Regions:
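Conserved PLP-enzyme active-site core in the AAT-like
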Residues: 1-156, 169, 174
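Residues at beta-strand starts and edge strands
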Residues: 86, 161-163
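Short beta-strand
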Residues: 155-160, 190
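Conserved PLP-binding active-site segment of the aspartate aminotransferase-like
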Residues: 163-190
Length: 190
């Protein structure tokens, strides 16, 4: 909770960074803006694992962690964009942390980077500039139609993030396998 983060960071001077995941696997988004304010009041770096939120920057309302005040944010591009597995972006929002980011990457990076992954990121950057916005509008519309079509049959988790479709099977008293079989009849694989 925001209160527990505030109590921990403002009372205890030992945390140097706060690492959170947002959105989570189910599309639930943390209040990054409020968390960033608390972190900055206590001189704590806010690092966000945005693995499932790579596209948040391109929504009508930008809720990408960097836009909301995170100091650093990692996007797993391969999860939501046409990028080879392992391709991702590290965004650094504070110039004071650029050298720290480069140093950390030198510890974890390979001396033999994958040029295929790097090329897929470059091609994806081109796609983002040329086609993503129109494709994103279409995908969001399709997700909304799907939610409407199945609103009486399934329960969906509420999320600020419109690109995740999370079925709450426990509310409909069915197993995930039952749901998968039902969706398969509509050519939907999950």
């Amino acid at each position: 909770s925001l209160q527990s983060i505030k109590e921990t960071l403002l009372v205890d001077s030992s945390p140097k960074a706060l690492y959170i995941t947002s959105p989570d696997y189910y599309g639930m988004v943390a209040d990054i803006e409020s968390i960033a304010k608390i972190c900055h009041q206590s001189n704590t770096i806010l690092l966000v694992d945005n693995a499932h939120g790579t596209l948040l920057n391109f929504l009508d309302v930008n809720i990408h962690p960097i836009h909301l005040g995170a100091d650093m944010c990692s996007d797993s591009a391969h999860k939501m964009l046409p990028v080879l597995t392992g391709g991702g972006y590290l965004h650094i929002n504070n110039s004071d942390y650029v050298s720290m980011g480069k140093t950390a990457m030198s510890f974890f990076g390979s001396t033999s980077p994958s040029y295929l992954i790097m090329e897929s990121l470059d091609l994806c950057n081109k796609y983002i500039q040329e086609s993503l916005k129109s494709d994103l509008i279409r995908v969001i519309e399709n997700i909304q139609k799907l939610k409407y079509r199945f609103k009486d049959k399934f329960c969906f988790a509420n999320s600020k993030e419109p690109l995740h479709l999370t079925f709450l099977t426990w509310k409909t008293h069915q197993s995930g396998l039952d749901l998968a079989n039902q969706l398969r009849r509509f050519n939907i694989e999950c």
